Amino acid sequence: VFGGEPEASGHAMALAISNLLGLVCDPVAGLVEIPCVMRNAIGSGNALISADLALAGVKSRIPVDEVIEAMDKVGRNLPAQLRETGLGGLAGTPTGEAIKQKIFGNAEDPVNSFS
């Protein structure tokens, strides 16, 4: 999109992923809405800024392949409550629980309550 060499795209990717490494997935009420929509916007901005940095000659100190490996390891080591279960993080706050209650009522498992 911006031009540049393949090496710059690798640095842009490494910079972008490094900035978001360890970000939890905590959808309120199990819905990909709160806080996901805003995080997607922030992620888009992060990607564009990382691309601009790489095109300006900023290089990731950690090679992109190692950043990807680290991302995999971090993701596997995150507690289950922080991996899109709707149980931890913002989903587990009193307000997050109240939103879930308002949407789904007393359903124990809102994701599977419609089957």
Listing of model-derived features with the role each one plays in the protein:
Residues 2-115:
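Functionally critical mobile loop/hinge segments
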